[in-house]
């Protein structure tokens, strides 16, 4: 059996002994049939938990996986860290007792639980450290799952327990997906906590009762939408975004790009789907709006194109739920009858940024070989487009983060964490940032001055662009109005 090699940098630190941590480099050999624990045993003098709980390249790993599988996921360059550097006890082991002390006040408020139930929190506590959030007040995902467990055991205390995790600055509404930060991108934790958020936003607890009411009021349907089964058009561009995000810059550049690609676009009155929190607050309303939008495109014989990441991820989720639940389709189609629409499986949707990345048969007139871009996207894509236009856009883990949804529930935390991302990109030396999310674009552009003050850093004028704008500039387009650049807060001066 062949011997394979791996380069590993290991976090070394012992509390009460070391002032600063350090990373020690190892070149390890392994065989195809070996597991992570076999590898850790080669690290002489390094402390670790035999019930695997650590981070590889900032991704949490909780299983003794085969090394070959881990190499396929992480490549052959690893950085091993404890789940939390803040609570590092020795090397890869954290001080869980110190973490548990944070919940002493909570336990004083629930005197009815048993000693065994109190100790149950220990089984959840490691989950707190998957989430990369930097909000120091955040109570933690593991703690939220523990409270959910208690709610099932004490249904009469459900509302009181829910209220304890409802605070805007520290509570469960601050949760964002952790799937990208967990080995194998497991989304079970996401679904468990989304369910808890749904329970909270449908309760009578303030401010979430009003938050839900206000969001649901934004679902607006056209009572008599147009229907042209055989139109002289080929596609429709989804255009129903929250008004404060000012999507015109993105929509204008996306439309121009599609026209240059030979597409003919029909404008349709799509319905807002509630954005990030739509599917959490009311699954049925979210699915109805999504089905309406898909059925409207179908009724007009066109493909439905999404030029924005968050809306595209929403429609993917909606289609998956709808297409796997015929009874939900039947229920929603009853509602759609009033609009003379019918939802059916197989309606074509397209993500414009994937199109930009794959359809490259056009002449490059303005290469970007002198520029560096910092891209922020939750959807992994190849570098085909960047290679075509000769743009350097280095990968970094934080590029998968998006804290813009927090602006709706905890503005200060959302601003701080979005601004942290913005300056990570700027400090990499980026000439411009690339946002695939309208919410993140809004934070980077419109809120940058306010956010920089809170972040305690002088505001930087580095602009943020959308992918269609970059593609158009690479094709030679220089009209700032046509590109939608005139609506940006930070002016793009490189044309």
Q: Model features per residue range: what roles?
A:
Residues 2-24, 36, 202-495:
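Iron-sulfur cluster-binding electron-transfer modules in prokaryotic oxidoreductases
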Residues 2-216:
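Signature of N-terminal electron-transfer/Fe-S-associated modules in redox systems
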